[in-house]
Amino acid sequence: KNVSLINLDRCFDFLPEAWQCVKCHEMTDQVLLKSAKELDKTFQWLEKSNFEPQFMPIIDNDEQALDFVLDTARYYRYPAVELVFKDDSHRMISSEVIDRFHAMGIKVWINSLTLNFPLCGYHDDICSLFDDPNKGWGWLCDHGADVIQTDFVRELNEYLDQRY
């Protein structure tokens, strides 16, 4: 308590129960709620909630979700957005969109975990560790990532220390 950030990630199906649990432990100010599913319904729930958790939308290869987040960012202050993209050509990773998020004070969070499907256009941990970190983590930095989620924190920190 008062030390950690609670990441409620993709929990829309049981969000009221999860939120009640956090309230019982008086830790509502430590929550970051992340969701890609039904952003409009999540947003409606947030508006009705007595408490306002920090909400970070996950935009998962979805133009409609991207536009929804860009539109609602005018009146709901997102601390960050998580961008999930299959390849480099997706509009969400364009400098125009990234610059727009940054101009609104919204951090860009990119997940570089390696799964069975691309989360960041294959600029992931495997690319960074076994090919060239400049093509992985470096590419993400060059394209505006403020936060890189990784399972290889030490290696990423070493790369960033070397780079900067």
Predicted regions and their residues:
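C-terminal active-site rim and adjoining tail of enzyme catalytic domains
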Residues: 56-164
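Metal-dependent phosphodiesterase/phospholipase catalytic core, i.e.
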Residues: 1-64, 83, 104
